[in-house]
Design a protein with these regions (language model features):
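N-terminal, positively charged regions that mediate nucleic acid binding
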Residues: 1-57
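Glycine-rich, mobile lid/loop segments that gate access to catalytic sites or pores
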Residues: 111-198, 202
Length: 226
């Protein structure tokens, strides 16, 4: 399924080398101020350019095509689109014959009987996380007052010293290898009683969404009382 959530419902579409990536968000109250400029900071953090990130360069300018009028949300589903411009589809000409390790090429081919779009990973590409970033921007707009986030890269390739991260990445690139890492996110001011028992607990729902990010292979959740 490409749809997630209940009160704040996300629907994602598009492929890595298609014309657009898009997301529709349902459940946003009417009267929330929103503009394309609100997305700039978070989209810039996601944008490639740092060592170890994808060489793909996309402007990622959000086009808000529904659910917004006179700078305010209307209460209708909010639809946001991002154009795909930096595509090199010729690089994937042999993907259907030579599947890439640790990618979804083989599984997608068999799941969809060979009708899937293999270019850049198609619908399974991390390119679609630009839509999740956009959803996060909107979600922060409607959070209760007092909820704050603090996020950092805690570890790369076993190194916990930020000053050593670049060297770890350089060494991995020289060996044509890859390394894992840990991202730490602390949320303060979470309302009491968030979530539902068992299948829709806060931990269950958070982990569910986090694992939709292709690079996420493990999630650890804990409570810290301050």
């Amino acid at each position: 399924m490409n749809i997630f959530g209940h009160n704040f419902r996300l629907a994602i579409w598009g492929e890595s080398h298609g014309q657009q990536i898009g997301i529709s968000i349902d459940g946003i109250p009417a009267g929330v101020p929103l503009s394309a400029e609100d997305f700039e900071t978070d989209l810039a953090r996601r944008r490639s350019g740092a060592r170890g990130t994808t060489p793909r360069r996309e402007p990622d300018i959000p086009q808000i095509v529904s659910g917004l009028y006179n700078g305010m949300t209307t209460g209708a589903p909010l639809t946001i689109e991002f154009a795909n411009r930096d595509t090199h589809s010729q690089d994937y000409a042999n993907v259907m014959r030579h599947y890439r390790p640790s990618h979804a090429d083989m599984v997608a081919y068999h799941k969809f009987n060979g009708f899937n779009d293999p270019r850049g990973g198609g619908h399974f590409s991390a390119r679609l996380t630009v839509a999740l970033t956009a959803a996060g921007v909107v979600a922060k707009k409607i959070l209760p007052p007092g909820v704050t986030f603090d996020t950092r890269v805690a570890e790369i390739g076993g190194c916990t010293d930020p000053e050593g991260f670049d060297e770890v990445l350089r060494a991995a690139a020289a060996e044509q290898d890859s390394v894992g890492g840990i991202i730490e996110c602390r949320v303060q001011g979470v309302p009491l009683g968030l979530g539902q028992p068992f299948f829709d607990s806060a931990e269950s729902m958070i982990a569910h969404l986090l694992f939709s990010v292709p690079a996420v292979k493990g999630v650890e959740l804990s409570l810290i009382h301050i």
